[in-house]
Curated annotation (Swiss-Prot):
The lineage of its organism: Bacteria, Pseudomonadati, Pseudomonadota, Gammaproteobacteria, Lysobacterales. GO terms for biological process: biotin biosynthetic process. HAMAP family: BioB. The keyword Iron applies. The gene is bioB. Pathway: Cofactor biosynthesis; biotin biosynthesis; biotin from 7,8-diaminononanoate: step 2/2. It comes from Xanthomonas campestris pv. campestris (strain ATCC 33913 / DSM 3586 / NCPPB 528 / LMG 568 / P 25). This is Biotin synthase. Residues 40-267 form the Radical SAM core domain. PROSITE patterns: RADICAL_SAM.
Length: 344
């Protein structure tokens, strides 16, 4: 099957895909998936919060926002040796990438050397690295690239025309600017959003349209299901229909055929059957481990059991002799993390 990568999708086309009969949509998405990936392979990453809580932003979904009473207290940036110990555990459990998230609006310049040290140490272990630290300027993006960072996560969260219902402390253009800085220095991008925040299907179409018409498709696209945390404004929101979530995965796969599509936050509450439908619809990446920053995630044993039942296997790593890396660094074609639970 020949699949053309397009950047000129219009919303009517994407809306028409959403409206297809469910079996037809899954057939199309699975066909696109098979054209670019081994459908039996799923990329596995581990995510660690290296700086938890105390964020000054007002994202309505986030338990790390300091203005909400969620029981999450502000903590200082972790020491590098503690991060390395967690990375070592992740590698032993089978992860091929280690993702580091910090609850910042944007890092201060004094924080960058500390994060750079974490990146260098984790890469020296043979893991790929990703980070999500909030908004970056051009100089900060360059410093992270020079430290050896592989991917940077910065989500759009939702459609441009629903954004003001969720966030007021950061503009949509701010997110696009950070993505531009990241692309300009040659970092790979991880960018997706969250569904189940009270948005309509048209808003979900709008999010995918914004992602699929970026100058370059994100290398990985995390699709997060809202994790409702008491104390956040979105707690108590009507849950999204499970089939609508699968449709979101399927249309993302069709619109961005060469991107990794990741099941991110909210997977703990998903049945094995729902996850299987998502894999059939084109999802090919998950986070491994019992926690995503401050919210739960399926434990490793459950994921291993699900992989065995479905005949899936973790994506294998390859060697990439990139110029900024140390000789012998091990790489994998995989995805990245996020600064809050919604990769999220």
């Amino acid at each position: 099957m020949s699949v053309v990568v397009r950047h000129d999708w219009d919303r009517k086309e994407l809306h028409a895909l959403f409206a297809l009969p469910f079996p037809e949509l899954l057939h199309r998405a699975a066909s696109v998936h098979r054209a670019h990936f081994d459908p039996a392979e799923v990329q596995v990453s581990t995510l660690l919060s290296v700086k938890t809580g105390g964020c000054p932003e007002d994202c309505a979904y986030c338990p790390q926002a300091q203005r909400y009473d969620t029981g999450v207290s502000a903590q200082k940036l972790m020491d590098t040796e503690d991060v390395v110990a967690k990375a070592r555990q992740a590698k032993a459990a089978g992860a091929s990438r280690f993702c580091m998230g910090a609850a910042w609006r944007s890092p201060k310049d004094r924080d960058i050397p500390k994060v750079a040290a974490m990146i260098r140490e984790v890469k020296a272990m043979g893991l790929e690295t990703c980070a999500t630290l909030g908004m970056l300027d051009a100089g900060q993006a360059r410093a992270l690239k020079d430290a050896g960072l592989d991917y940077y996560n910065h989500n759009l969260d939702t459609a441009p025309d629903y954004y003001d219902s969720i966030i007021h402390t950061r503009q949509y253009q701010d997110r696009l600017n950070t993505l531009e800085h990241v692309r300009d220095v040659g970092l790979k991008t991880c960018c997706g959003g969250i569904v189940g925040m009270g948005e309509t299907r048209e808003h979900r179409v709008g999010l995918l349209h914004a992602l699929a018409t970026l100058p370059a498709h994100p290398d990985s696209v995390p699709i997060n299901q809202l994790v409702q945390v008491p104390g956040t404004p979105l707690h108590g929101t009507e849950p999204l229909d499970a089939f609508e979530f699968v449709r979101m995965i399927a249309v993302a796969r069709i619109a961005m055929p060469k991107s990794m599509v990741r099941l991110s936050a909210g997977r703990e509450a998903m049945s094995d059957e729902l996850q299987a439908l998502c894999f059939l619809a084109g999802a090919n990446s998950i986070f491994y481990g019992e926690k995503l920053l401050t919210t739960g995630n399926p434990d490793t044993e459950r994921d291993q059991g699900l992989f065995q039942r479905l005949g899936l296997r973790p994506m294998q790593i390859t060697v990439d002799a990139a110029e900024h890396d140390h000789p012998g660094t091990v790489h994998a074609d995989i995805t990245c993390g996020a600064a809050c639970e919604h990769a999220a």
